[in-house]
């Protein structure tokens, strides 16, 4: 050690340097920082494995991928954390270590004898010595140099601790040797990369090198070196113990230090943590030599324990961060407006390009087609017709009575500026008693004027409805939710002006009584408006706009009642979606139930107004059931006091799907009287049953005459004339019957003919059952109805033509076909063919062809047909039908008697068979008893 005074004078103050370094050592090694006693520890010998330098250098550079176990810290603190882990490997190293006490930890844990033994063992292993780059003058500062270069490598692995310490020491030695002959400067930068290159050049890889005892430091030299740091002149050059931030891939860090001109090793400022590295370099040799194996094993266990704790904490932090990210992303996803989900395309009907057949038809449609008798060839020839009739068949069979009300009567458009009348179901309807089967509307949706000769002048109070009454139209689909979400339509001034002729007390707008036909239109209009007040189910597109957030479309009334509901619904998360859906469905069902109850109360209230009070059984006597209609039984009775025959139709209101339609029928019939329409007498409500008293036609229906008698052309003309007269009246009121057939044409004993909305079904046979198997009786339907096209009042003219064929041949065309095949034949065949057309006169043929034109535009109207030659010249008087009515009635009575006798005979035969069976059983029992008695006697 040189005693150059200049060098000593330039060294920094020892106390100030040790205070800064000891504080860092306390944080890293658990010291208490209460003094510098560690500086006075005795020195011990040290060795340097030069062979390990090169391997350690390579391993240190290859360990660049190591990452910090603590994600909360930056990458630049990795080296400090790793050193902290290493320091825990030896509990003895928890003493204060200053920059001058190089091997104080070693001296405190091992005696000089153990160090000497270790040195001897190392010398025995590697006797070759290479001192080409090491001089005895520098031997006292080798360990300081090791500390100096330790900061150049900030990433290392625990398995390379011993090699790293030696490598750093050698790098610093070479570095010091390089700057030895330089001029003294205030600060010089030392790059450990260059030093690493120099040491590799100086030390061959193939030569194992280990230091001689000359490399060891004595306690005296260490104390001298420690004392050399006490000069306060170089306080401004006090080295920073904090490691600089490493660059990418752990590049060595340049450390600025001050070196004297002659002995640069004196000014080597040892950073913290190198003492532990130098110690572990020797402890790794001890593992190889087998000394202190128990202590090392405990150290290994403790080290692995600490590292596992670090890893677990790192995994927990990563898991928590990932869970936080996932939760935040889930919240973001919950608040994001999604696209439609769970969409299903159940059926896709296509056409095979080769065969031309439909592919992908629903199973129900396939069954209908196969059971209907429509062959594959027919399906291929008229594919679109098949599709239309299948849809129509399903609509007719699945529709309810309330929807039928919209299909029965005509539609009139409101004023253009009315937002409440945006769809046809929101329009007014004129109604008259239809039949028990379906009937369709033919009203206007465009408001185009028609000829005025079919209109009643009293209907001009509503110009828009009068002008566009007879434009052919189909019932439009149900209005969207926007219609139901609007304000109550019945209170709008536009609808008030349209309904200003209603005499009812239920109308919410001011009304002007009128005894003419406008009463019917206003009555039906009010019922239609009440229909619109029903809450509609939510439309799916409004849901998908905020999915998966549950929200519903509210009407203004609902929003006013619960203004906080939308805000609560928009905060929902996908996890609460099923609960929200269930609650929403429950609310909708509850609202529907309340609406049904409300409408039921309104229905009974309205019935009580239009019906008479009292018990009908006290006013009518001798009730005899003569038929069973679709909506109730039909009875005949005599009015007490006058002895007039009446027909009573009894209906259970709870079982009626079309209660509103029944009310409108009663109201229309009350205000309408026509000689060719069955007149309404009175109505009663008794114990939940509606009793409708009507004019009784004792001759029965035209069906009895057709099935039992043969009509002449004159008699057929009489029936056509009376029927057309009634249709003209209905059409003038904006009503179409849509179910004209022989069952709904009633006759009196004098031959008078009247239209009715129900048919007598006293004749129970196969033919009559076929007529009533399907609501709407497709055999009399017009092609435009079957093909789902727009239609108007001329559908009744087509039905009249089919009824003419029925009167000629005894049955309508296609009666023996299934209803679906009959619809197919009507749609594809057009005008049906007669069996014997040559037997008809030219006037009847012309009249029939005019009635059965496929195109509605070419078909005649009721007024035009009334002026036809066949009606004016060939048709006979009504009295000509009286003999046919009497004959048909006699035959019908005879059939009923025969049927009763057959039933009695069948009952007698069954009784005789049962008696014979009983006698046979008794005989067998007696025989068995006799046999048993004889056996007993023998015994």
From Swiss-Prot:
Region (Disordered): 1-87, 176-299, 311-331, 407-487, 500-598, 899-939
Keyword ATP-binding attached: yes
Superkingdom assignment: Eukaryota
Modified residues (Phosphoserine): 87, 165, 169, 418, 502, 547, 562, 585, 924
Transmembrane segments: none
Compositionally biased region (Low complexity): 251-283, 320-330, 542-552
The entry's keywords: Acetylation, ATP-binding, Cell cycle, Cytoplasm, Kinase, Nucleotide-binding, Nucleus, Pheromone response, Phosphoprotein, Serine/threonine-protein kinase, Transferase
Effect of residue 649 to R: Impairs phosphorylation of STE11 and histone H2B and mating efficiency
Residue positions, PTM Phosphothreonine: 167, 203, 573, 773, 927
Record-given protein name: Serine/threonine-protein kinase STE20
Domain free text: The CRIB domain is required for the association with CDC42.
Ranges annotated as biased composition (Acidic residues): 899-908
PROSITE patterns, alphabetized: CRIB (PS50108), PROTEIN_KINASE_ATP (PS00107), PROTEIN_KINASE_DOM (PS50011), PROTEIN_KINASE_ST (PS00108)
UniProt modification remark: Autophosphorylated and phosphorylated by the CLN2-CDC28 complex in a cell cycle dependent manner.
Record-annotated CRIB domain positions: 337-350
A GO biological process held by the record: MAPK cascade
List of catalytic residues: 739
Family: Belongs to the protein kinase superfamily. STE Ser/Thr protein kinase family. STE20 subfamily.
GO cellular component: cytoplasm; incipient cellular bud site; mating projection tip; nucleus; plasma membrane
Known outcome of mutating residue 477 to A: Impairs interaction with BEM1
Catalytic activity: L-seryl-[protein] + ATP = O-phospho-L-seryl-[protein] + ADP + H(+); L-threonyl-[protein] + ATP = O-phospho-L-threonyl-[protein] + ADP + H(+)
Organism: Saccharomyces cerevisiae (strain ATCC 204508 / S288c) (Baker's yeast)
């Amino acid at each position: 050690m040189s005693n150059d005074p200049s060098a000593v004078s330039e060294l920094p103050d020892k106390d100030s340097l040790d205070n800064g370094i000891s504080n860092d050592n306390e944080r890293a090694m658990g010291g208490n920082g209460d003094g510098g006693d560690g500086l006075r520890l005795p020195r011990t010998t040290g060795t340097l494995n030069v062979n390990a330098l090169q391997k350690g250098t390579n391993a240190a550079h290859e360990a660049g991928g190591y990452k910090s176990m603590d994600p909360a810290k930056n990458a630049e603190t990795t080296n400090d954390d790793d050193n902290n882990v290493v320091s825990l490997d030896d509990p003895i190293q928890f003493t204060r270590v200053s920059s001058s006490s190089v091997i104080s930890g070693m001296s405190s844990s091992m005696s000089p004898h153990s160090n000497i033994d270790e040195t001897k063992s190392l010398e025995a292993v590697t006797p070759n010595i290479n001192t080409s780059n090491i001089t005895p003058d520098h031997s006292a500062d080798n360990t300081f140099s090791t500390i100096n270069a330790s900061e150049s490598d900030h990433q290392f692995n625990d398995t390379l601790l011993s090699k790293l310490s030696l490598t750093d020491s050698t790098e610093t030695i070479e570095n010091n040797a390089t700057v030895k002959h330089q001029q003294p400067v205030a600060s010089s930068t030392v790059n450990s990369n260059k030093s690493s290159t120099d040491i590799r050049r100086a030390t061959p890889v193939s030569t194992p090198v280990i230091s001689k005892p000359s490399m060891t430091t004595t306690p005296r030299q260490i104390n001298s070196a420690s004392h050399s740091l006490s000069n306060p002149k170089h306080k401004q050059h006090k080295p920073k113990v904090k490691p600089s931030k490493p660059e990418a891939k752990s590049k060595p860090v340049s450390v600025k230090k001050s070196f004297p001109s002659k002995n640069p090793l004196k000014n080597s400022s040892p950073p913290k943590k190198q003492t532990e590295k130098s110690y572990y370099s020797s402890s790794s040799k001890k593992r190889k030599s087998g000394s202190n194996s128990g202590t090392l094993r405990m150290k290994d266990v403790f080290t692995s324990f600490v590292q596992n704790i670090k890893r677990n904490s790192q995994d927990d932090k990563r898991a928590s961060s990932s869970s936080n990210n996932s939760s935040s992303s889930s919240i973001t996803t919950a608040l994001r407006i999604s696209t439609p989900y769970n969409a299903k395309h159940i059926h896709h009907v296509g056409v095979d390009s080769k065969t031309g057949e439909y592919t992908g038809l629903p199973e129900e449609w396939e069954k209908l087609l196969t059971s209907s008798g429509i062959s594959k060839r027919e399906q291929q020839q008229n594919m679109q017709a098949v599709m239309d009739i299948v849809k129509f068949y399903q609509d007719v069979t699945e529709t309810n009575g309330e929807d039928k009300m919209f299909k029965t009567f005509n539609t009139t458009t409101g004023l253009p500026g009315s937002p409440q009348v945006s769809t046809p179901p929101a329009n007014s309807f004129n109604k008259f008693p239809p039949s028990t089967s379906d009937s369709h509307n033919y009203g206007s949706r465009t408001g185009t004027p028609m000829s005025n000769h079919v209109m009643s002048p009293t209907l001009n109070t509503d110009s828009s409805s009068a002008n566009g009454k007879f434009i052919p139209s189909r019932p439009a689909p149900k209005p969207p939710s926007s219609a139901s979400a609007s304000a109550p339509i019945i209170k709008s001034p536009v609808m008030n002006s349209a309904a200003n002729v209603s005499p009812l007390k239920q109308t919410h707008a001011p009304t002007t009584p009128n005894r003419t036909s406008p009463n019917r239109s206003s009555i039906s209009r009010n019922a239609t408006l009440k229909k619109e007040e029903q809450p509609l189910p939510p439309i799916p597109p409004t849901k998908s706009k905020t999915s998966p957030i549950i929200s519903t479309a509210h009407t203004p009334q609902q929003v006013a009642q619960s203004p906080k509901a939308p805000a609560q619904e928009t905060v929902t998360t996908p996890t609460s979606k099923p609960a929200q859906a269930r609650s929403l469905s429950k609310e909708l069902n509850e609202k529907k139930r309340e609406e049904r109850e409300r409408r039921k109360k309104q229905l009974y209230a309205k019935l009580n107004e239009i019906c008479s009070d009292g018990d009908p059984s006290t006013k009518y006597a001798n009730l005899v059931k003569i038929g069973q209609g679709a909506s109730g039984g039909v009875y005949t009775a005599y009015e007490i006091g006058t002895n007039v025959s009446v027909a009573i139709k009894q209906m259970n209101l709870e079982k009626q799907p079309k209660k509103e339609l029944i009310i409108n029928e009663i109201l229309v019939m009350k205000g309408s009287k026509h000689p060719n329409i069955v007149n309404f007498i009175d109505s009663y409500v008794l114990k939940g049953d509606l009793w409708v008293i009507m004019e009784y036609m004792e001759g029965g229906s035209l069906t009895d005459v057709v099935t039992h008698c043969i009509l002449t052309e004159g008699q057929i003309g009489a029936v056509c004339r009376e029927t057309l007269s009634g249709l003209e009246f209905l059409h003038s009121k904006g009503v179409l019957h849509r179910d004209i057939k022989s069952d709904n044409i009633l006759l009196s004993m004098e031959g008078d003919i009247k239209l009715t909305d129900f048919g007598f079904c006293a004749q129970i046979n196969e033919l009559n059952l076929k007529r009533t198997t399907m609501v709407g009786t497709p055999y009399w339907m017009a092609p435009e109805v079957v093909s789902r096209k727009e239609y108007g009042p001329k559908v009744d003219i087509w039905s009249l033509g089919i009824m003419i064929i029925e009167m000629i041949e005894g049955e309508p065309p296609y009666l023996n076909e299934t209803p679906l095949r009959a619809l197919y034949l009507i749609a594809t065949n057009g005008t049906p063919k007669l069996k014997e057309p040559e037997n008809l006169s030219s006037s009847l043929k012309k009249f029939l062809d005019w009635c059965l034109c496929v195109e509605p535009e070419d078909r005649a109207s009721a007024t035009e047909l009334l002026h036809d030659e066949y009606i004016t010249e060939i048709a006979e008087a009504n009295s000509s039908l009286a003999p046919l009515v009497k004959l048909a009635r006699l035959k019908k009575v005879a059939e009923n008697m025969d049927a009763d006798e057959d039933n009695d005979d069948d009952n007698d035969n069954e009784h005789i068979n049962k008696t014979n069976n009983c006698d046979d059983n008794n005989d067998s029992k007696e025989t068995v008893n006799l046999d048993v008695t004889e056996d007993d006697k023998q015994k």
